[in-house]
Amino acid sequence: MNEYLFPIKIALFTFPIAAFFLTLPFLIIQYRKYGYVNKYRAFILYSLLLYAMSAYYLVILPLPANVNNCTTREALTHYMQLRPFTFISDTLKETRVVWSEPASFMHLFKERAFLQALFNIFLTIPAGVYLRYYFRKGLGATLLFSLGLSLFFELTQLTGLYGIYQCPYRLFDVDDLMLNTLGGIIGYWITPILAAFLPKTENLDKDVELDKMTVGFIRRGIAYIFDNIIIGIATSILSMIVSASSAVVLQTTDIGSLEKSFINAFSFVIVIMIYFMVIPTVTGGRTLGKWITRIHVIADRREGELQEITFMDLVKRYALLYYGVYGLFSLMAWVANYGELPAYADVALLLVRAVFVFVLGAYFVIQLFRGNKILFYERVSGTRNVITLREEMEDHQGTSS
């Protein structure tokens, strides 16, 4: 039994790591496809990930101690068992069961050949359940997928983990193909019994009103990451262009650090204006990050009427955030680096910056637990993020084309 428990323990240990790296693409796919993240759907898909990792580890573990694992040079067919139903003869050969004594049948659960066959059936039962319950596949598709999954497992073993090991360290067994496929079919058959205790997947999005949903900070944070990657790249490119142009005009190759800081600040101001104010005016309040996460900025008038965003709305929104808050913090950092202040002034400025960061941090933490998720620069500018509805996406794509 330990040979089966060990891979599952490894799967449980590595699952959080895999989940961490897959969370960002998972969220993006959910936002793009459904417009929001359904917690129950997330639970299903993460449980599917855990099952897939467990099944894969059960197939490949334990690994040989050495990649040079060939004891003798044999033909590939030496590592293949191609006679169907060999597991039956192996079970009958090893068993201590007396068929006329039903009480002796319990011995089967202690015998290697029977347990191995049973394991191969159980290995793919969850796959059949997922296929029918969540992916809503029919019997034929479940059969083909289960067979394909089993073939993938067997080829993984036959190729020595895709060539990492010189020789296969487990047999390619035709019985495993049959038993794994049977497991998938059993999973398909028992799904209605299990589904009676679970929500219907076709109803997960039934009562969802995207137009009334609040855009959360995780979603906005993902958009922020993509947008600021672009901002950083664009600012660097523009800074190099301006620096090169300045060097030509001044006929020098030595631009001082102070001049470079001015050029970087100038480039940042221009990029912010183009990316966050000019482009969203044309794209209906969308930047690349917002498009990826399926949100856009709208004007939220005091009368409660939502309107399309204008250039001046965007200027108020992003000038306050980037030129105001971020600009003030950058100015203090610039003074600290280039101001040549006395020691007491440096300490005072450091304290001011620390208080500034603390106040902002506390403010964002407080807003995190508030219902409306509206930040100060949005209140002042009368703007906010909303989820882009499917028809709005289609209209925007049609207009763009």
Model-derived segments and spans:
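Individual transmembrane alpha-helices with interfacial aromatic-anchor signatures
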Residues: 171-182
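Bulky hydrophobic segments
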Residues: 1-168, 185-289, 299-401
